Amino acid sequence: MKWIFILLTQIFLCAQTGLEIAQMLDQKPAPKDLSNMTRMILTNQKGKSRTNIMISKSLNKNKKQMIWFQEPKDDRGVSFLKVEHESGDDMRMWLPAFKKVRRISAKKKGDSFMGSDLSFEDLSNRNVNNNNYTRLSDEIVDNLDCYVLEIIPKKKAKSSYGKHISWIEKKTLNLLKESSYNKRGDIEKNKVFQYEHIKSYHVLKKVSVENITKKHSTEITFSDIKIDRGLRDDLFHEKNLKRLPK
């Protein structure tokens, strides 16, 4: 009987469509809230680096997020708020040097986030309904069996990308790596993701982004990770952009 179960499991895995895999990923269990210290290292083509230290807090699978910059000194006080809606994302930045809150419009979501190789679009979850998914041939990545998905944004997504190729580990549904292409079909970015097992969750520990076109890279590491601490919904409000957390 055991071999029948294994066979049926394999048939089920092989039969899943790209959309079904994307839906599984979207429904993957995650902490109710998450806080961490974030270190972001930017490196240009000459090898010169710049390091940012941030505090990040998020709620509901990162659909609400606040980021406060701590270092370097000239960026201290800059902060970012994101609230995702079905109709679109509300993103705002507090820029203390100008004493103003800047709203990030849909036309600007392809812009770089604080000089990094992540765009504002990269900071948002992808709405499953805003993309077309094609399952490509499965591959092995670092000895892990992976689904491979081609993701093409629909027009309504207003994406700055033409497509993504994503490698997703079958067992954990962790996104291991992704290549993003511009609308001309040229590869633009390669991203690699690493995870830490905390309680019953796989939580992002490190993200590495290589910008092929700009010959620039970004490495983001997360430390002092805390989950399910009961963050309040009213934390994610514009008024708190100006309030550095203790």
Feature locations, PLM:
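Sec-dependent N-terminal signal peptides
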Residues: 3-13
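Flexible, processing/modification-adjacent segments and terminal tails
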Residues: 16-33, 39-41, 48-50, 75, ...
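Extended lipid/amphipathic-ligand handling interfaces
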Residues: 25, 54-59, 192-198
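One face of beta-strands
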Residues: 34, 38, 65-67, 91, ...
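A short, compositionally biased
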Residues: 35, 61-62, 85-89, 172-175, ...
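N-terminal, post-signal-peptide region of Sec/Tat-exported proteins
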Residues: 37-75, 134, 173
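Short, ordered beta-strand-loop transition motifs
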Residues: 58-62, 137-145, 198-200
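Gly/Pro-enriched, hydrophobic low-complexity segments
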Residues: 81, 111-113, 119-126, 145-237
